[in-house]
Regions:
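Loop/helix-junction capping segments adjacent to catalytic residues or to phosphate/diphosphate-binding pockets
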Residues: 13, 100, 131
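Conserved G/P- and acidic residue-centered "switch" motifs that form tight phosphate/ATP-binding loops
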Residues: 70, 101, 118
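Active-site acidic-Proline motif in GNAT/NAT acetyltransferases
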Residues: 94-100, 128
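Conserved amphipathic alpha-helical interaction elements at protein-protein interfaces in regulatory
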Residues: 99, 112-116, 143
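C-terminal "cap" of GNAT-fold acetyltransferases
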Residues: 120-172
Length: 172
């Protein structure tokens, strides 16, 4: 069966569990790097509760879930920023699934979702400590650019043109 990627409601149990895992990992990594500790549990809960994922709901966005042999193991989101630009966000795979090719499949699914939303380019931001993410994006043809936002947690910004040939958009 292998890897599959499909649309998921942001409020599904699967999506909520993946959002919690993603947020916990990126928050803990930031705090460990900058303050030498994991995220305070109360702060972690506030952060998780602080995003309902509304920006990832059609028609302006889409949440995708990666599954391996049917088991949900990762996610990615896209949201329209303007008529031709979408942002890639929440790209995540459980640690035990990394290095198995799923990240490339997940990002390809997100690129297809962005095309389906009408985007001709996809932008994203990431942090310096997320070295593996930066390597992935460069390997997949993303180019480092000037900042497209003022996120406190962003150190690197990337962009990729989404070539859309007639009839090339796949349903997700």
């Amino acid at each position: 069966m292998g890897w599959t990627v499909g649309a998921e409601a942001v409020d599904s149990d699967v999506a909520v569990a993946l959002w919690r895992a993603y947020y916990t990992e990126v928050s803990d990594r930031w705090y460990l790097l900058h303050e030498g500790r994991a995220t305070d549990p109360d702060e972690l809960e506030r952060g998780i509760a602080g995003s309902d994922g509304a920006e990832l709901v059609p028609p302006g966005g889409q949440l995708l879930v990666a599954r391996y042999d049917g088991e949900p193991v990762g996610c990615a989101g896209v949201r329209l920023l303007d008529v031709g630009t979408a942002e890639l966000t929440r790209v995540f795979l459980y640690q035990r699934m990394r290095g198995k090719g799923g990240a490339a499949v997940l990002v390809a699914g997100a690129e297809d979702a962005a095309r389906a939303l009408g985007a001709a380019r996809l932008v994203l931001d990431t942090r310096s400590d997320l070295v593996e993410a930066r390597r992935l994006y460069m390997r997949l043809g993303y180019t480092e650019t000037e900042p497209h936002n003022s996120s406190r947690y962003a150190d690197h910004w990337f962009c990729k043109r989404l070539d859309v040939a007639p009839g090339s958009v796949r349903e997700i």
